[in-house]
Amino acid sequence: MAIVKCKPTSPGRRHVVKVVNADLHKGKPYAPLLEKNSKNGGRNNNGRITVRHIGGGHKHHYRVVDFKRTKDGIPATVERLEYDPNRSANIALVLYKDGERRYILAPKGVNAGDVIQSGVDAPIKAGNTLPMRNIPVGSTVHNVELKPGKGGQLARSAGAYAQIVARDGAYVTIRLRSGEMRKVLSEGRATIGEVGNSEHMLRELGKAGASRWRGVRPTVRGVVMNPVDHPHGGGEGRTSGGRHPVSPWGMPTKGFKTRKNKRTDKYIVRRRNK
């Protein structure tokens, strides 16, 4: 994988930094694992904006990724690595010995031709998926299940991982990249190793248009809006906003805690690092 800095042949190219992976598949994705992915521009069924900064962007299909990894005891060979426009991580197309193909998150160090496996008897090797009760303490994992059988929900983006730091009865304690330590059920599954494409964080889009290609619209500051649009809006000339920073709906921002799910507080051993 190479980091390529573009020559400044135009203002839009001057700051572009690309991450080039020669191992990625150059052709089309595997058609049976594609689904329609319609755009909604951040609008709900009433046509009102519910998520800002969404709109436009290149058309693409959704790749059906197997986050559950429940095909136990059947080895699978990695056929190829592919780019996925729906996530920062790359994905791998694997062929099981019974002939079925699936997409999985491409772990770091796993390449075409490697053999992976799922189940309680799977060896501790990058790309293999096991219940966390069978994974040694200290191991690095990704695609961690919060609820057994639901599929992995934690540590799925490029370069992400969690570490198993303790095991206590029905629970294991994991440390996340944010510094948070939390308990999860030991029956839940996780995949050994960390997610690949960790160089994703080094890329520079270089221009606003590159964000628009990805369906991301501009973020406008509240102080330049009108009073009808934002609590910081209005005033004659440039103003400081006149109050502590808030969201467009009046909720304090910049450090204000918004976590509401008290039901799961008991599973958080230590809050994330600030």
From Swiss-Prot:
Entry's Gene Ontology cellular component terms: large ribosomal subunit
Disulfide bonds listed in the record: none
Keywords for the protein's UniProt record, in alphabetical order: Ribonucleoprotein, Ribosomal protein, RNA-binding, rRNA-binding
Gene Ontology MF terms in the entry: rRNA binding; structural constituent of ribosome; transferase activity
One BP term from GO: cytoplasmic translation
Domain of life: Bacteria
InterPro entries xrefs: NA-bd_OB-fold, Rib_uL2_dom2, Ribosomal_uL2, Ribosomal_uL2_bac/org-type, Ribosomal_uL2_C, Ribosomal_uL2_CS, Ribosomal_uL2_dom3, Ribosomal_uL2_RNA-bd_dom
Region (Disordered) residue spans: 223-264
Main function: One of the primary rRNA binding proteins. Required for association of the 30S and 50S subunits to form the 70S ribosome, for tRNA binding and peptide bond formation. It has been suggested to have peptidyltransferase activity; this is somewhat controversial. Makes several contacts with the 16S rRNA in the 70S ribosome.
Family from the record: Belongs to the universal ribosomal protein uL2 family.
Quaternary structure, from the entry: Part of the 50S ribosomal subunit. Forms a bridge to the 30S subunit in the 70S ribosome.
The protein's name in its UniProt record: Large ribosomal subunit protein uL2
